[in-house]
């Protein structure tokens, strides 16, 4: 797949506004500041494709990017400490759940987790949802360039031990990644390619 061909299609506030439910979609999810926009820009080799914001939680829409042949990348709203009311946060969450449960063309989720921190409630929720809806999930442990070898091993172990608490994790994979140094980029593309086949 040539990810550098990605083009912005639209932003939708609601799942009902999304284009026809055909083809293949891969969704990117992550807490605010997990490095989601940077990862999308690195993957597509386009600096400004997804806006990298200094204000966490700027992504309030479901943003879609076309890869050609009815394949799409989907940028889900950044979740976390966005400066919005609880009711808006709940609205985002219900739209996200609606997307994950109702979108038939969704073939996988990329969950971005800051490798320097423990898994947060949102991360656990996304992993649990992926398992319960039998979805492919690839966890990107971002900002790995900021870790030494010992810390990288710890980050891998953290995910490993968390996944051991579930019975069915055969559709879940994970890796270290850095948008800055492009560490893990080839491995990440290979994983996505299998989902778009």
UniProtKB/Swiss-Prot annotation:
Residues 22-197 form the EngB-type G domain. PANTHER family: ENGB-TYPE G DOMAIN-CONTAINING PROTEIN, MSS1/TRME-RELATED GTP-BINDING PROTEIN. GO terms for biological process: division septum assembly. It comes from Francisella tularensis subsp. holarctica (strain LVS). Belongs to the TRAFAC class TrmE-Era-EngA-EngB-Septin-like GTPase superfamily. EngB GTPase family. SUPFAM superfamilies: P-loop containing nucleoside triphosphate hydrolases (SSF52540). Mg(2+) binds at residues 37, 59. Disulfide bonds: none annotated. GO terms for cellular component: cytosol. NCBIfam families: GTPase_YsxC. This is Probable GTP-binding protein EngB.
């Amino acid at each position: 797949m040539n990810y550098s061909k990605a083009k912005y299609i639209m932003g939708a506030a609601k799942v009902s506004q999304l284009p026809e439910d055909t083809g293949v979609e891969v969704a990117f999810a992550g807490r605010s500041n997990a490095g989601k926009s940077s990862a999308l820009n690195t993957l597509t080799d386009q600096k400004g494709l997804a806006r990298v914001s200094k204000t966490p939680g700027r992504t309030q829409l479901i943003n879609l990017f076309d890869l050609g042949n009815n394949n799409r990348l989907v940028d889900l709203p950044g979740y976390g400490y966005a400066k919005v009311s609880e009711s808006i946060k709940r609205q985002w969450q219900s739209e996200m759940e609606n997307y994950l449960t109702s979108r038939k063309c969704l073939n996988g989720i990329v969950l971005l987790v800051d490798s320097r921190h423990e898994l947060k409630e949102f991360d656990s929720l996304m992993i649990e949802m992926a398992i319960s809806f039998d979805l492919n999930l690839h966890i990107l442990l971002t900002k790995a360039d900021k870790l030494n070898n010992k810390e990288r091993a710890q980050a891998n172990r953290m995910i490993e031990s968390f996944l051991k608490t579930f019975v069915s994790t055969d559709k879940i994979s994970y890796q270290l990644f850095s948008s800055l140094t492009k560490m893990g980029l080839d491995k990440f593309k290979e994983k996505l390619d299998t989902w778009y086949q």
